[in-house]
């Protein structure tokens, strides 16, 4: 019995409107309700306008009679005055005669609600929070006269629910009040109605229903007595905390978040690792480019982007590569870096530590200390740079299938603690001294590499260049030299010797749960093109020294991002070889960049860029209407 009473699904009762219990009050509308100005200002404006144009038209009429001018010969000011006269007259008649007009044309509101055609069109859902199941035939405190009051607390707007609902008719209500047997398979009416918070229902698409307890919490957050960041720990329900924080934010700012979805997301999955103080989530469309034939295997590449033409262009590049036999990618290096900065009292002491760290005899000892931090992290090298009495130590290590920033940081901290024994005068200024260098364009990443260093190449047949890419080998080679090489050099580019590598990198990063900010160094790329096979075919390659990706940790564990990794066959940690999945992901990113570079350069060479963007990347919506 107890188990049957504790239903996990909260049922919903729908009250059918009738003549006795209308869902909305019969309040007649007025013409002034359609205007945003206060009533007294609206009336003053139209009264003034009405008498002004009447005086003007009568004066003009008198002048025309005196000058023997036909009355139908009107000037532009007279036309404007006539329109103003008609508009003000309509308003004044509507304002003072609305009740009379409605009585002649429109049925009373009570008759409207009582019609059979409207009974199913105006259902009001009353959600129960703490209801209890009552056996059939028991006396219930749910008399019929209380129903209209409860119904008025909920907006009479049709609400949809995916769950099946039971319709409580007026006859059922009379049976309950008389103690007769009624089908009580659902819960009884709630002891207290929910509080409905609605703001400008004709402009908002959502109605937030909160309990009295949630309403008190919202008021506390708005008042500042309850910190917003503590809602998850205090409530124990991440989604409820997000909903309360969202409503409090709307009240504090006076701005609506109706376009930002709340439902359909697992907020437990981001607690303490991906995002703090969530109020919803942003939806980004994911397109598929491919198949990309890379190293003898086909990949369907997911790309999350809002830029039109990007997926289509990359897809065209994949087609050209596939028709030409595929592309080949080679991993050159795999090592994440972290560079702390330490300071000594003299430059001599800083140099002594530099010589100590770069001595091969000391590397094994330092590697043992470093490798204690993780079973995947393995120290590869230490590179030092001095600036006066400050020393920058750039540690490089393998990190398995993780991107590895946290892993290398823990290993570096172990080494710094170990060095304090022999260098007690060493002052650690920061665990990161920007010699790493993370999320910033830096020559050290371009030259030394960071993360995965990959090169990818393909030979595109001349027929494919002409038929698929709609250009020629000679045009592509010339454009690549003048744009990607000479043009980038003229601009003083650092790692930017490409057409749009960042576009593809960022789209794949967002889709697969990588850190989008690391596209700064991950997009370092040089694109090379040259004619081969007596000038008939095109050899194209991209070299990317700093691709920072992982298949475990961070955003990769989220459902959507995990699905995209699974599509590529690199989800989670590799069961065979540590780091194999993350290295495979890096090669796929490089192959997709190769396809994107090939297609965009072809569009530029053929003069198709502007035409394609006007067709696929131009909004057809009137932004002024959206903003209003």
Curated annotation (Swiss-Prot):
A single Gene Ontology CC term = peroxisomal membrane
What's one Pfam family here? Answer: HMG-CoA_red
What does the UniProt keyword field contain? Endoplasmic reticulum, Glycoprotein, Isoprene biosynthesis, Membrane, Mitochondrion, NADP, Oxidoreductase, Plastid, Transmembrane, Transmembrane helix
Associated pathway:
Metabolic intermediate biosynthesis; (R)-mevalonate biosynthesis; (R)-mevalonate from acetyl-CoA: step 3/3
Report residue spans for region: Linker.
99-212
The record, for InterPro entries, names: HMG_CoA_Rdtase, HMG_CoA_Rdtase_cat_sf, HMG_CoA_Rdtase_CS, HMG_CoA_Rdtase_eu_arc, HMG_CoA_Rdtase_N, HMG_CoA_Rdtase_NAD(P)-bd_sf, HMG_CoA_Rdtase_sub-bd_dom_sf
- The main place the protein resides is endoplasmic reticulum
Q: Which reaction does it catalyse?
A: (R)-mevalonate + 2 NADP(+) + CoA = (3S)-3-hydroxy-3-methylglutaryl-CoA + 2 NADPH + 2 H(+)
Q: Which enzyme class?
A: oxidoreductase
Q: Identify the glycosylated residues.
A: 153, 371, 484, 617, 625
Q: Which domain of life is it from?
A: Eukaryota
Q: Where in the cell is it found?
A: Endoplasmic reticulum membrane; Mitochondrion membrane; Plastid membrane
Topology class, membrane: Multi-pass membrane protein
Q: List all membrane-crossing ranges.
A: 38-58, 78-98
Family annotation (Gene3D superfamilies):
3-hydroxy-3-methylglutaryl-coenzyme A Reductase, Chain A, domain 2, HMGR, N-terminal domain, Hydroxymethylglutaryl-CoA reductase, class I/II, NAD/NADP-binding domain
Gene Ontology molecular function terms on file: hydroxymethylglutaryl-CoA reductase (NADPH) activity
One record GO biological process: coenzyme A metabolic process
Record-stated family: Belongs to the HMG-CoA reductase family.
Q: What does this protein do?
A: Catalyzes the synthesis of mevalonate. The specific precursor of all isoprenoid compounds present in plants.
Q: What is this protein called?
A: 3-hydroxy-3-methylglutaryl-coenzyme A reductase 2
Please name the gene that encodes this protein: HMG2
């Amino acid at each position: 019995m107890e188990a049957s009473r504790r239903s996990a699904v909260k049922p919903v009762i729908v009250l059918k409107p009738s003549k006795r219990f209308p869902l909305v009050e019969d309040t007649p509308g007025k013409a002034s309700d359609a205007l945003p100005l206060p009533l007294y200002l609206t009336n003053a404006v139209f009264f003034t306008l009405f008498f002004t144009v009447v005086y003007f038209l009568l004066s003009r009429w008198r002048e025309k009679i005196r000058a023997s001018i036909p009355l139908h010969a009107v000037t532009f000011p007279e036309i404007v005055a006539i329109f103003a006269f008609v508009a003000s007259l309509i308003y004044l008649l509507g304002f003072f005669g609305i009740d009379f007009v409605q009585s002649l044309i429109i049925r009373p509101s009570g008759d409207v609600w009582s019609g059979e055609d409207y009974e199913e069109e105006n259902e009001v859902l009353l959600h129960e929070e703490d209801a209890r199941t009552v056996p059939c035939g028991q006396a219930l405190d749910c008399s019929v006269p209380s129903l209209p009051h409860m119904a008025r607390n909920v907006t009479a707007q049709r609400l949809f629910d995916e769950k099946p609902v039971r319709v409580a008719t007026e006859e059922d209500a009379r049976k309950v009040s008389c103690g007769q047997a009624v089908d009580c398979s659902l819960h009884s009416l709630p002891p207290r109605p929910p509080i409905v918070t609605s703001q400008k229902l004709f402009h908002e698409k959502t109605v937030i229903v909160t309990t009295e307890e949630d309403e008190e919490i919202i008021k506390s957050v708005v008042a500042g007595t309850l910190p917003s960041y503590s809602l998850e720990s205090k409530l124990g329900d991440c989604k409820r905390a997000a909903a309360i924080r969202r409503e409090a934010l709307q009240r504090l700012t006076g701005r609506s978040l109706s376009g930002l979805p709340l439902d359909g997301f697992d907020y437990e999955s981001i607690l303490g690792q991906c995002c703090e103080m969530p109020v919803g989530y942003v939806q980004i469309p994911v397109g598929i480019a491919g198949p990309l034939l890379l190293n003898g295997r086909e990949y369907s590449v997911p790309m999350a982007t809002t830029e039109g033409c990007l997926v289509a262009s990359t897809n065209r590049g994949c087609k050209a590569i596939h028709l030409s036999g595929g592309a080949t990618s080679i991993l050159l290096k795999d090592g994440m870096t972290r560079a702390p900065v330490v300071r000594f009292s003299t430059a001599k002491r800083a140099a002594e530590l530099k010589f100590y760290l770069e001595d091969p005899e000391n590397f094994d000892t330092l590697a043992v200390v470093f490798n204690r931090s993780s079973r995947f992290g393995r120290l590869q090298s230490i590179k030092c740079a001095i600036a006066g009495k400050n020393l920058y130590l750039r540690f490089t290590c393998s990190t398995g299938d993780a991107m590895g920033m946290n892993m290398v940081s823990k290993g570096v901290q172990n080494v710094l603690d170990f060095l304090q024994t022999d260098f007690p005068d060493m002052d650690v200024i920061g665990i990161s001294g920007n010699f790493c260098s993370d999320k910033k364009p830096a020559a050290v990443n371009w030259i030394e590499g960071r993360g995965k260093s990959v090169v990818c190449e393909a030979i595109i047949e001349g027929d494919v260049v002409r038929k698929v890419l709609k250009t020629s080998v000679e045009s592509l080679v010339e454009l690549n030299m003048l744009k990607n090489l000479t043009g980038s050099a003229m601009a003083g580019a650092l790692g930017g010797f490409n057409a749009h590598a960042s576009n593809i990198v960022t789209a794949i990063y967002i889709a697969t749960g990588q850190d989008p900010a690391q596209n700064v160094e991950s997009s370092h790329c040089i694109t090379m093109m040259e004619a081969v096979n007596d000038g008939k075919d095109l050899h194209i390659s991209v070299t990317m020294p700093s691709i920072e990706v992982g298949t475990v940790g961070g955003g990769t564990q989220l459902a959507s991002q995990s699905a995209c990794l699974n599509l590529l066959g690199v989800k989670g940690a590799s069961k065979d070889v540590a780091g194999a999945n993350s290295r495979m992901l890096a090669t796929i990113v490089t192959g997709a960049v190769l396809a994107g570079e090939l297609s965009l350069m072809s569009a530029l060479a053929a003069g198709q860029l502007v035409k394609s963007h006007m067709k696929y990347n131009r909004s057809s919506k009137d932004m002024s209407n959206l903003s209003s």
